[in-house]
C-alpha cells in the first residue's frame, strides 16, 4: 500500500468492479471509513462491515450491481481521483463542479470534515476536491 490512501481506495474498488467481484476488502483508516460511509449514504455501495484479522482492521464493502438483459450484472460505479499529493486542487463553494448535472458526487475535504459537494454548498464552504464519483 502506497502513501496515497484515497487513490488506493479508488483502485481497490475499480479493480473489484472490473473483475466483477461482489466484495472489496479495504484497509481501515479514518479517511477510508468516512469516504465509504459517503458511498453508502449516496447509494453507490450496498453494505459496509468492519472486519478484524490478526490485529489489523479492514472494511468489507458489498458493491451494488444492476441487472441488465445483455449482461448478467453491470456496475454503475465510476471513480476518478482529482487532487493528488503532488497537485492539490481546491475550490470555493461557488466553483465546485457538478458531475453529470448533479447525478454524480464530488467528495471534498473541508475544514468541517469530508463531505459531498451538496453538503459543502449548503454549508457554504469549499475545500480540497478528493474525487469524483458517478
UniProtKB/Swiss-Prot annotation:
UniProt KW Protease keyword: no
Q: Which Pfam families match?
A: Ribosomal_S8
One GO biological process term is: translation
Among InterPro entries, the record links this protein to: Ribosomal_uS8 (IPR000630), Ribosomal_uS8_CS (IPR047863), Ribosomal_uS8_sf (IPR035987)
**Record GO cellular component, one term:** chloroplast
Where it sits in the cell: the answer is: Plastid, Chloroplast
Annotated GO molecular function terms are: rRNA binding; structural constituent of ribosome
List the SUPFAM superfamilies hit by this protein, alphabetically.
Ribosomal protein S8 (SSF56047)
Keyword Cell inner membrane attributed: no
Give the UniProt keywords, A-Z.
Answer: Chloroplast, Plastid, Ribonucleoprotein, Ribosomal protein, RNA-binding, rRNA-binding
Q: What does this protein do?
A: One of the primary rRNA binding proteins, it binds directly to 16S rRNA central domain where it helps coordinate assembly of the platform of the 30S subunit.
Its quaternary organisation is: Part of the 30S ribosomal subunit.
Which family is this protein grouped under? Belongs to the universal ribosomal protein uS8 family.
HAMAP family, per database record: Ribosomal_uS8_B (MF_01302_B)
Query: Under which name does UniProt file this protein?
Result: Small ribosomal subunit protein uS8c
